[in-house]
């Protein structure tokens, strides 16, 4: 007797390897429970692979954008640019680590649900596995806007610092010119008195 409220959803095709692992770990499970569990693991693997690929593409895009935007500032002020690029790389690493922590949390949640499956009814277990799979498939882990915002902030800071340095150099140049004029006037006045 099955619960009529549990709706049938299409099961993601699981690899033979994944199915065999699930069968080994759950020898007394029904074929449907094994298929749903294997589908959950496939969804997790699919999502993790997509996130790794997206993170790689996003990291490459962010890096190229940062290099293009900051190329002028890098030539003019290499030390400042090096510090800013290091900060961007650090931010990207932190975002990647956060994404892996989310994937690990999803995996842990799925494993906990598999362990609890022996204690709950077959229908409740299948429902929990389907919900976990849906959560994995709908979860967005990469925050593209935050990485682009960090790159833009780095560019703004580099330009602002460069303008401050240029103003200071211009001010020094003006003071040196004024000092040279004053020295020349004093020197010519001294020689004019002697003649």
For the regions a language model picked out, list residue spans one by one.
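N-terminal acidic, proline/glycine-rich, low-complexity intrinsically disordered segments
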Residues: 1-11
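Amphipathic alpha-helical membrane/lipid-surface binding segments
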Residues: 15-195
């Amino acid at each position: 007797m099955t619960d009529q409220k549990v709706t049938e959803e299409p099961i993601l095709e699981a690899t033979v390897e994944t199915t065999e692992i699930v069968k080994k770990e759950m020898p007394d499970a029904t074929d449907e429970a094994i298929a749903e569990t294997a589908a959950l693991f496939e969804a997790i693997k699919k999502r993790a692979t997509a996130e790794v690929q997206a993170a790689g593409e996003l990291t490459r895009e962010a890096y190229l954008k940062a290099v293009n935007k900051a190329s002028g500032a890098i030539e003019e002020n290499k030390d400042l640019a090096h510090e800013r690029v290091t900060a961007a790389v650090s931010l990207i690493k932190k975002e990647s680590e956060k994404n892996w922590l989310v994937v690990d949390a999803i995996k842990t949640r799925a494993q906990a649900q598999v362990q609890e499956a022996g204690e709950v009814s077959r229908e409740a277990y299948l429902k929990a596995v389907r919900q976990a799979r849906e959560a994995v498939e709908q979860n967005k882990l990469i925050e593209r806007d935050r990485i682009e915002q960090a790159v833009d902030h780095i560019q703004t800071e580099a330009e602002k610092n460069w303008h401050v340095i240029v103003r200071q150099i211009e001010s020094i140049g003006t003071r040196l010119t004024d000092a040279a004029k004053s020295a020349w006037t004093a020197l010519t006045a001294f020689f004019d008195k002697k003649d």
